[in-house]
């Protein structure tokens, strides 16, 4: 059974880029590696999340033929307990892919996993005691009830919101409803930092001396 390594991160922190670079480095060392990413937008559960919940512009136009997601309050404002089930269902639906990857590779890299649910849903709760309870509920839901494998390592890429705004200006991809919600993003960022301390994640700071680090510089630290 291979090792499960999860890469989490704040908005625009480069989760996809870093996991793809890790795949390249592992393959050069003849290490069998598989990369997965959640939500899996090309699956039925992923399409529900991308189009109906988050209102991703390209998916909405192709699937729903409307101007936004199904939820009038916006993807970042949906009741936390209701929202966790969408993301948890996507991982449970794709559990066979995770198990197959672990059984046939030395390392499985996942871009966003259960921690993402904990941060983005828990971050919506201002009361710390209730927020910690939410973390526990999500762990129970995903790891115990849905039987997802627990990660061997979680790497957290930390890019503060104000620096993410700089990178967003150069992006061609249109933001979804959650990505346009500043309060949602900032609360998620704070929750990620709290989770990193509570669960002892490996934190990689994407900013040094008030400058965003280069992709390769960050990857060297992630790989080490």
What spans do the regions from the language model cover?
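ATP-dependent small-molecule kinase phosphotransfer cores
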Residues: 29-140, 144-145
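ATP-binding Walker
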Residues: 12-13
């Amino acid at each position: 059974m291979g090792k499960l390594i999860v890469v989490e991160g704040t908005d625009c922190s480069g989760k996809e880029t870093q996991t793809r670079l890790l795949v390249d480095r592992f393959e050069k060392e003849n290490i069998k590696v598989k990369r997965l990413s959640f939500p899996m937008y090309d699956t039925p559960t992923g399409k529900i999340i991308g189009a109906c919940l988050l209102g991703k512009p390209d998916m909405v136009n192709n699937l729903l033929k409307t101007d936004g997601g199904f939820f009038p309050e916006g993807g970042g404002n949906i009741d936390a307990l209701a929202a966790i089930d969408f993301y948890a269902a996507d991982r449970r639906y794709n559990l066979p892919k995770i198990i197959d990857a672990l059984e046939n590779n030395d390392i499985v890299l996942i871009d966003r996993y259960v921690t993402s649910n904990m941060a983005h849903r828990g971050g919506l709760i201002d009361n710390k005691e209730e927020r910690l309870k939410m973390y526990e509920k999500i762990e129970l839901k995903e790891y115990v009830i849905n039987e997802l494998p627990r990660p061997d390592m979680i790497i957290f890429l930390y890019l503060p919101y104000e620096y993410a705004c700089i990178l967003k200006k150069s992006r061609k991809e249109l933001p979804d409803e959650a990505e346009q919600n500043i309060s949602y993003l900032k609360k998620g960022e704070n929750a990620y930092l709290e989770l990193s301390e509570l669960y002892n994640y490996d934190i990689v700071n994407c900013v040094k001396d008030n400058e965003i680090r280069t992709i390769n510089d960050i990857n060297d630290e992630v790989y080490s």
